[in-house]
């Protein structure tokens, strides 16, 4: 599953739409992953002490839970914490490709895309949960449809196998419906606003912001009938790390996590939030007023909330349960063939020690 992509075919760019793909964002990294990862891991294992001291290379992209790091970058907080980092800006899918090719120590990804990336050969471990989507992913319907139940017998546009396909499945299940009760129209995420506006027989589309907002603008009277706020924890975002880097640089990764929680506090504090939003919006080419709703649709996780989400459980309030759900979706929709060992992708030790 993948996310913001060039309007989230990968979480590509919120300013110029993008987001999840593995069904949560395959935020594109399937093809080159296995061979490139083998090369990357070999290089990592053979790293000299000088190489080990190099800045941590972290890929980030246009999603509020990743853009939040821009605050720390511009404030110099990583230097204050004594950790040398090199944050590299990508379209979402390109960041996963770079990670799979061994060019990054870590990358910002949805929990579902972490599984997709690993299934493709690029092993990774989620050590920090930055947020969960809380409204930025939507099922947008046009009149006369006003409820999820109203989708029965209708055509619904989604990018099959991506995160908002998962959102649609979740919406249907919560309202005693199933996919066979409607007809899926497969389209690229960035094409969905046009599909909704121009196709008279397409009743709704599933997309993330800002693509969802574009659909709402194009179709008078359209409205979200189900969002990720209705299924908190369905889509987590994380910093997922190459296991070799994690093993050799644990102290540095602990510092990165500590800085993250400083970012969350700064963003959530009403006194400093305007400055934080100014920094974040500038990174993606939006005004603070344009960016604030996107931030509000993202539930950033502080240390206490992350500790709770890192607790093993079967529900969506646990990243374990959420990832099992994503794994089942990925297998069911042939994103990959073999179910993944979810626990192998999650290591809460450093975050829980904060």
Language-model features: where?
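Bacterial N-terminal signal peptides
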Residues: 21-23, 29-44
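Sec/Tat signal peptide C-region and signal peptidase I cleavage site
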Residues: 45-52
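Short, glycine-/small- and polar/acidic-enriched structural segments
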Residues: 52-193, 199-209, 225-226, 233
